[in-house]
Each structure stands twice: as C-alpha cells, then as structure tokens.
C-alpha cells in the first residue's frame, strides 16, 4: 500500500509524463504553438492542414507579405520601419493591442486573425482579406505566435462577451458625455475628440515610441472598428502597451454610455467605401488623348475608388483616390483625382513641401497572389523584382507654367544675357527633367529609387487643382522599347499601385499615403 507521500509523488510523475506526451503530440517544430481556447465554430478549416505543413505555409506567407515591416525575426524592425509611424508591432513580447480577451491576457487566435483580415485603419497595416486565403491567414497566425515565449507558457483567457448593444437613448449619450469628462478622457483626446488634448504630445508606449492620439470623430481612425460593440470592447479591454487603459472599474452600463456618446459624435459622412485591392478596367476609346483632366473624354470613362494607407499617422489623411483608365490604338492614359483642400505647388523654401502623385507598375508578367505570393512588394518592389514608377509633381508643373508665361511676356528679350551675361541659366542646366512635370523612375526595394535617363523619359502629364480636388492625367505611348518601362499587354491583368504626397502634411520621400496592388484589366 502506498503512503500518502508516495501517492503524491507518483501522481506528479504520471502528470509530467502525460504532459510531455501531449506536448510532443502537438509539436511541429520550433514555431509550433498550441491553439487558443474557446474557438469551436470560430472558423472553418483551421485544423484541416497538418501542423508541419501549416507552419511551412505560414513561414512562406510571412516572408513575402509581413517581413518588410515586422522583420524576419518579428521584432518590428523590417526594412520599411524607418518610413512608418506608428512602428510595426514587435511580436516577440506577445503584447497585442486588439483583443477580445481581458486586459493583460494573450489574444485568441481569432483576434490575430481579425487584425490580419481587417487591418488597422489609420496605420500602415493594411487589410489582407482579399490577399490571403483562409488557410494562409490561419497559418500565418500560428507562425506569428511562434515569435513570443508567452504563447508557450500562457493560455489566453476566455473572450469577453459584450452582449446586445443597448439603445443609444439621449439620456445614455448625456451620461456618457459626463463620464467622458469625469474620466479625464479630454486630457488626451480633447474636448472635441480631435486628439489634441494637453497630454497628447507627451504620451509614449512600452516600447518608448511616441503615441499618436487619433481623431475620435473620424470613423476611419478607429483601428478596431467604429460600431458600438467595437468601441465598447476597446473600453473594456484597453489597448495593451499604450496609455489607453481599460475602464473595467466602471459598470457595464457606464461603458455603454461612453460608447453611445462617442458613437454619437462620429462624422459618418467621412466614411469612404473603397477596397484595399480591387479590379480596375481600362476603357477602349477612338479619341485622341489630351492632357486636360477636365476634357469631355473623361466623362465617358467609368471611375473606380481605391483605398489609401498612411505610412505616417496624421489627423486628416487622404483616404482614397479615384481612378479612370483609357486606351486607344497608340497610347494609354490615366486620370487620378483626390481631395486636397489646399494646393501646395511650391517647394522653394525649406519649410515648404509640394503635392505629388505617383503610379507604380510591376514589370513583367506577374500575377497577384499566385505561386507563393511572388509579386513585387507594393512598397517600391524588392530585390530582383523591379517596379516602374511615374511621378507627377505640382512644383515642377508650376515652374513650367511660370516659365511659359515669362517666355510669352518677354518675347524678343534675351533674359539669359540680361541676368547671366550670356550664359545659360545654371539652375535650368541642373534640372534636365524640368520640361515635363512627370518623372519616370525604377526601384527594386527601399533606397534604390533611380530616375531613368533623360532620353528614356516618355511619360507626359498635367494636373489641375479645382474646388478642393487635384486631378492629374498621365499619358504614355504603347510602343516603348525601354526594358525598364511597363509594357501594356492584354494577356493578363497589370499590377498597379498609387501614392500621394500632401504638402500640407509635410510629405516628402517615404512620407506619403499609398495603396496596395490593384489589378488593371486592358480591353
């Protein structure tokens, strides 16, 4: 007969053996992680793929889609990091801002899944819903978990269930407004919710990065969704790693009251329905192209709206761009339009920044999201995967138009003789592209942007600012023989992306808003 001490000893031994067998039964390599609890019915096909195969797929997806920002080892220090604010998440700490679990808990798999699928509005994290399959998304969830020891040692707590959304009655909104003041929310978010409270410029997260306080009146700025249930969840869970604490010390009703107040202040007219990745279609026309963006030709061309991603957090980013594409027997033309209340046409002073827009094309016959996602990275391409870029600049066009007006006003007068003693204007001599407001370039990754030689520049363009909008036309003939130019063939969709620089936001170089790849179909 065992003594009580012997019995306890053998129970512990059997427990350790059983745990070890269970752990080995689920181990698929160094990155294999256990599933999180309470997820029955949360998704389909999560466990259909064997563990080792799933981890291999996750590693492939991460390499092609995530490593540029989050880094090969998940530390948030990818090659794009220097151009981004907020910085990409450091997965090694196992701290995730969006969760349905209580404060301090690890997220559930489905929380990470939702972040990947929906993206984080207002940041450089796009929505990968149309880019990744279900299997790919769940695979990369498991791969990401492998960067942190927390997933090996902790089990996430069960998800918080918010319950039904109560009616946003006037008394609930009034109570929420009072609580907003009592909880001193205005210290960060401001009394008008615009994110300009007295503490807004003094906040840092646990990574010692400055925190950007978003405009809570802008529904596009809610990272985790602007529906009442989304706002309630953020108030309940907080945003781990940031000064945004949870408000669990308030009653459930009080949190719903604050939710009702915040939701009542949303400027819903700012919501723009547009896709991260869509299909664009070029229209075949018989007309000759002109560079005027307001020519009647463009009235006959259908318009598509593409969503833009700010690489640097800002209060009023350009959120979308409108695209029209046309093709005739000799050339291709595009009309781009976006909102911009103030035209920034000059960069002559060091404190001035100009407006600009660019189109980016993947070279060669590459398809989107096939063969292991081997398309170029939409952010300037990557090594061995060159992109062709057309950039229009407002300051260049202003200089050209000013020069034309000056030439007309001074016909018969040799200004070079008067000003430079017969020598050519030295500034003009240093700007070989100044006869057109468009420059054609190539890149194969960050830091490789290279203008094409002057003799190879064959893209024309013109921009017009009118009624708070920029409209820009790009034009190029189809017969380019330059191997670094995009060839517009009809056999498969062309990958095209867009970027906008807003001078009022001090945009320049890598500071801009961009799109993901779009599929352009030619007639």
What are these regions (language model features)?
Residues 466-523:
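Long, compositionally biased interface segments
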Residues 305-430, 486, 490-510:
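Surface-exposed, glycine/proline- and aromatic-rich loop segments on solvent-exposed faces
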């Amino acid at each position: 007969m065992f003594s009580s001490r012997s019995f306890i000893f053998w129970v512990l031994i059997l427990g350790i053996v059983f745990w070890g067998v269970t752990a080995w039964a689920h181990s698929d390599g160094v990155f294999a992680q256990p599933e999180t609890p309470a997820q029955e019915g949360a998704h389909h096909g999560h466990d259909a793929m064997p563990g080792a195969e799933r981890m291999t797929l996750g590693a492939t997806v991460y390499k092609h889609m995530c490593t540029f920002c989050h880094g090969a080892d998940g530390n948030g220090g990818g090659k794009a990091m220097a151009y981004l604010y907020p910085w990409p998440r450091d997965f090694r700490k196992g701290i995730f801002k969006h969760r349905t679990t209580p404060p301090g808990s690890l997220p559930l798999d489905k929380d990470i899944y939702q972040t990947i699928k929906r993206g984080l509005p207002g940041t450089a994290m796009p929505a990968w819903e149309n880019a990744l399959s279900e299997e790919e998304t769940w695979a990369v969830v498991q791969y990401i978990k492998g960067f942190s020891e927390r997933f090996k040692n902790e089990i996430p707590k069960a998800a918080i269930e918010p319950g039904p959304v109560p009616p946003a009655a006037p008394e609930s909104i009034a109570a929420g407004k009072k609580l907003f003041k009592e909880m001193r929310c205005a210290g960060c978010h401001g009394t008008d919710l615009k994110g300009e409270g007295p503490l807004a410029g003094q906040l840092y997260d646990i990574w010692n990065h400055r925190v950007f306080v978003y405009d809570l009146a802008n529904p596009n700025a809610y990272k985790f969704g602007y529906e009442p249930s989304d706002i309630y969840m953020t108030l309940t869970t907080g945003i781990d790693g940031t000064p945004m604490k949870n408000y669990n010390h308030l009653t459930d009703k009080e949190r719903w009251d604050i939710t009702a107040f915040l939701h009542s202040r949303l400027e819903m007219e700012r919501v723009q329905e547009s896709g991260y990745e869509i299909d664009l279609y070029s229209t075949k026309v018989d007309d000759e192209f002109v560079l005027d963006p307001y020519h009647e030709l463009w009235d006959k061309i259908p318009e598509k709206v593409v969503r833009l991603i700010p690489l640097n957090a800002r209060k009023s980013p350009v959120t979308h761009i409108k695209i029209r594409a046309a093709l005739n027997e000799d050339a291709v033309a595009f009309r781009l339009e976006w909102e911009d209340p103030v035209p920034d046409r000059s960069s002559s002073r060091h404190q001035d920044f100009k407006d600009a827009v660019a189109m980016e094309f993947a070279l060669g016959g590459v398809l989107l999201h096939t063969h292991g996602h081997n398309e170029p990275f939409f952010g300037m391409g990557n090594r061995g995967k060159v992109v062709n870029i057309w950039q229009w600049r407002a300051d260049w066009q202003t200089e050209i138009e000013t020069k034309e007006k000056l030439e007309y006003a001074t016909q018969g007068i040799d200004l070079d003789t008067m000003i430079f003693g017969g020598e050519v204007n030295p500034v003009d001599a240093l700007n070989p592209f100044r006869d057109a407001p468009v420059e054609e370039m190539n890149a194969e990754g960050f830091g490789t942007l290279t203008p094409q030689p002057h003799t190879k520049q064959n893209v024309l363009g013109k921009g017009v600012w009118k009624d708070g909008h920029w409209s820009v036309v790009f034009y190029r003939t189809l017969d380019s023989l330059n191997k670094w130019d995009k060839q517009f063939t009809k056999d498969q969709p062309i990958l095209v992306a867009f970027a906008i620089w807003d001078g009022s936001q001090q945009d320049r170089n890598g500071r801009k808003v961009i799109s993901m790849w779009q599929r352009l179909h030619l007639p």
